[in-house]
């Protein structure tokens, strides 16, 4: 899509990404100026106690699989640097420069900018125990750090040199050595390679390399960055269907389609007139609007794979993406979310967000600050967009809404990026509240992206709203991989029902030839029917937030809804304690698993 736009010679330009520090009218008139000045004061204290990154902390990943402690300290430095930079930009008094310079210097003295969990040169190979300082790796957060330091230079370079002559050159030199030179001279898997599958790494890293190049690379090198970036984005786009569905889930939209938006926007600025026509492509608009279609109500989104149901509030970047592709629904969702965050959230800029990697991109902060007034003004008059039903054939996801109910059904395969073995699973909401849930994923560890991934309970089909065969014996669950997929998938014309054969997702199960699941949503609730030729016992799992109460053939999920069950041999329930910090961001300390045992036929009517 993009590379074909470069068949003719094109010119590049050094883009203007934001007003210079000298434009005091632009910076001092920002509606968030006082908020950022206050954040800077807090950041001064944080900078004095900025965490160390000793070798022992790096080694925890290799030795115990714990990646969280290193990442907490690593990201804290970068969030603090963002706050100091924004505070200095809105005040321009030099108050924050000493702490900012010290912290930027410390980041430049880190042995590596990549995470321990990403310390490998070949995709899907074991991480090396230590970084090779002579051969930098450009991973997600080396690229993020390069963009951060480059943006500090682009915004405050002259001020830093006035404070410490030569400091800006040192900072730019580290960006060149650790990010730009490796990008030009080495091949990292996320840069794209023919038909090799890509994921959110591709646009995310590409966006940040372009930010670094736009502010640190000499003008004569820009064409090389543009050409490689355009190729990489094409490699990312090839893995999306024309319907625009993100197989990684709503939570990864901000790292996938949304970083692609900024990458495309940067390409348009760096190569004027070359790529602008891409914004009119239906596929790009569909990718933009995916997040609108997955939204249930309030903070909740339909979730599959590693995605959390709390996929995060939309904000300025989504608004700008919607504006670029002419999507009023996306602009509306984003503007209303951002206005609500500004009104009620004491940390709207995510400087203290539970997800440590939030709030570390200085360009995002500038982008949001410059558009904040426009977005909040738009929110005052924007009426909520009416949600609609959608079928995403590329991934096999149905979103259906009837009355108080919203249904998410997943067909597809077990080869998604961030995959869980969840073919055929359903999630159900009533009145915007979760009824049948997808638990999501625990805090990332060494095991999460390793051959042992499916030892983690949240990845297994037995902990989704799916059947398990021979539950008291062999416990046959689904298997990972593209071959383990739904078959004979049909969707109703009204987009209120989905049917499929789940048997292929389980591989070789003795006696299993067919497992037909059908779901149908009406204004009064959900009907789910499962039929199989498997001769033995099957246990259907239902995961819920509400505590189930069994009364004969009825399962009540608190006061939210009840399931009338036909065909059950027995029904058992268990409490599932939730202690993991990542899961606790979305769920209370206890979830519930209902197991409905049956043979060959089962019917549920939930309402």
Predicted regions and their residues:
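Non-membrane alpha-helical segments in proteins
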Residues: 76-90, 102-106, 143-151
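Active-site lining segments of carbohydrate-active enzymes
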Residues: 128-251, 262, 373-383
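Carbohydrate-active enzyme catalytic cores, enriched for enzymes
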Residues: 258, 262-435, 492-493, 587, ...
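Cytochrome P450 core scaffold surrounding the K-helix E-X-X-R motif
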Residues: 436-448
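CBM-like, beta-strand-rich accessory domains located in the C-terminal region of large
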Residues: 119-122, 143, 342-356, 446-607
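Extreme N-terminal leader/anchor segments
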Residues: 1-37, 83-89
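Solvent-exposed loop and edge beta-strand segments that line ligand/cofactor-binding
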Residues: 64-77, 126-143, 185-203, 241-257, ...
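Long, well-ordered core segments of solenoidal/helical folds
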Residues: 43-54, 100-118, 166-191, 224-244, ...
């Amino acid at each position: 899509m993009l590379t074909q736009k470069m068949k003719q010679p094109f010119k590049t330009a050094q883009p203007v990404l934001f007003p210079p520090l000298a434009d005091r009218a632009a910076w001092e008139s920002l509606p968030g100026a006082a908020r950022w000045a206050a954040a800077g004061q807090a950041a001064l204290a944080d900078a004095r106690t900025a965490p160390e990154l000793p070798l022992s902390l790096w080694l925890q990943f290799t030795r115990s699989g714990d990646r969280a402690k290193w990442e907490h300290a690593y990201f804290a430095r970068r969030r603090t640097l963002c706050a100091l930079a924004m505070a200095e930009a809105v005040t321009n008094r030099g108050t924050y420069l000493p702490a900012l310079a010290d912290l930027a210097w410390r980041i430049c003295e880190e042995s590596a900018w990549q995470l321990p969990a990403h310390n490998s040169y070949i995709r899907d190979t074991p991480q090396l125990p230590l970084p090779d300082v002579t051969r930098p790796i450009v991973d997600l957060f080396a690229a993020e750090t390069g963009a951060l330091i480059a943006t500090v230079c682009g915004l405050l370079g002259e001020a830093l040199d006035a404070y410490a002559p030569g400091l800006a050159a040192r900072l730019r030199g580290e960006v060149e050595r650790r990010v730009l030179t490796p990008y030009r001279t080495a091949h990292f898997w996320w840069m794209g390679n023919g038909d090799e599958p890509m994921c959110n790494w591709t646009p995310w890293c590409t966006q940040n390399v372009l930010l670094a190049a736009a502010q640190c690379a000499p003008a004569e090198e820009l064409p090389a960055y543009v050409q490689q970036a355009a190729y990489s984005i094409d490699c990312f786009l090839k893995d999306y269907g024309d319907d625009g569905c993100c197989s990684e889930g709503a939570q990864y939209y901000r790292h996938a389609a949304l970083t692609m938006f900024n990458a495309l926007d940067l390409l348009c600025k760096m190569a004027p007139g070359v790529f602008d026509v891409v914004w009119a492509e239906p596929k790009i608009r569909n990718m933009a609007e995916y997040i609108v279609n997955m939204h249930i109500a309030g903070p909740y989104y339909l979730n599959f794979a590693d995605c959390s149901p709390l996929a995060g509030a939309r904000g300025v970047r989504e608004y700008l993406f919607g504006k670029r592709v002419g999507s009023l629904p996306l602009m509306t969702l984003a503007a209303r979310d951002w206005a609500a965050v500004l009104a009620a959230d004491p940390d709207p800029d995510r400087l203290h967000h539970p997800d440590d990697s939030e709030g570390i991109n200085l360009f995002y902060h500038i982008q949001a600050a410059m558009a904040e007034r426009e977005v909040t003004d738009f929110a005052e008059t924007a009426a909520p967009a009416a949600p609609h039903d959608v079928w995403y054939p590329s991934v096999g996801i149905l979103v259906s809404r009837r009355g108080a109910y919203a249904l998410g059904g997943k067909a597809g395969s077990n080869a998604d990026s961030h995959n869980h073995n969840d073919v055929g699973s359903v999630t159900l909401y009533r009145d915007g509240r979760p009824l049948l849930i997808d638990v999501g994923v625990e805090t990332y560890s060494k095991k999460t992206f390793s051959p042992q991934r499916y030892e983690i309970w949240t990845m297994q089909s037995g902990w989704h709203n799916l059947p398990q065969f021979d539950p008291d014996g062999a416990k046959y669950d689904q298997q990972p991989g593209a071959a383990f997929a739904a078959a004979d998938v049909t969707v109703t014309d009204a987009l209120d029902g989905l049917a499929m054969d789940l048997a292929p997702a389980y591989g070789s199960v003795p006696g299993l030839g067919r497992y037909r699941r059908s779901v149908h949503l009406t204004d009064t609730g959900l009907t789910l029917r499962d039929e199989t030729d498997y001769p033995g016992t099957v246990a259907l799992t239902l995961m819920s937030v509400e505590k189930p109460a069994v009364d004969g053939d009825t399962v009540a999920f608190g006061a939210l809804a009840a399931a009338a069950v036909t065909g059950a041999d027995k029904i058992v329930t268990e409490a599932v304690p939730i202690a993991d910090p990542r899961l606790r961001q979305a769920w209370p300390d206890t979830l519930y698993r209902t197991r409905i045992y049956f043979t060959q036929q089962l019917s549920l009517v939930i309402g």
